[in-house]
Amino acid sequence: MKFLLTNDDGYDAPGLDALRGAVNGNSVTVAPLEHQSGCSHRVSMWGNPLEVTEKGPDVHAVSGTTADCTRVGLIHLVEDVDWVLSGINQGGNLGHDIYLSGTVAGVREAAFQGKPGIAFSHYTRNGNALDWERAGGWVRRVLDHLLEEPLEPGEFWNV
């Protein structure tokens, strides 16, 4: 199974590293060059060319939003993607937050492009440290179940 990974916290975010470890294999990362939290489903328009920089093997940084990253990844960088995964976001994306979330926008754009997606977020209480290794383990367990569940065109999961 081939995954396109993205997020809204930047290509070098610890949550994205944990997600990469959870899929353990056939993935390409296309994520924002800079932090894009709260960018919602904003996309770059005409006269604003996006720059794509290779940051490592199968890791690309885009000078745009999470939705831009998903679109660029699916259209220009990665062929035959089975799933788009976004996250692991630092903070929850619950209720109305999903409309503001760049993390969720990454998989919403995947749904617009005809690909299934899952957005992952790590809720924590103020002052508590995030355990990315543990979060990656939970993502792996959730993936084992959700990847077997069929999604209708235009649908995605938010975990």
Language-model regions, residue ranges each:
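A cross-family phosphate/adenosyl-ligand binding-site feature
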Residues: 3, 14-80
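Redox-cofactor binding/interface segments in oxidoreductases and associated redox assembly factors
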Residues: 5, 86-87
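Short glycine-rich anion-binding loops that position phosphate/pyrophosphate groups of nucleotides
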Residues: 9, 35, 65-66, 89-92
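Hydrophobic/aromatic beta-strand patches that form the interior of the parallel beta-sheet core
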Residues: 28-30, 60, 85, 116-120, ...
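Alpha-helix C-terminal capping segments
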Residues: 73-79, 105-116
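Glycine/threonine-rich flexible loop motifs
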Residues: 92-101
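Glycine-rich, Lys/Arg-enriched anion-binding loops that position phosphate/diphosphate groups
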Residues: 111-158
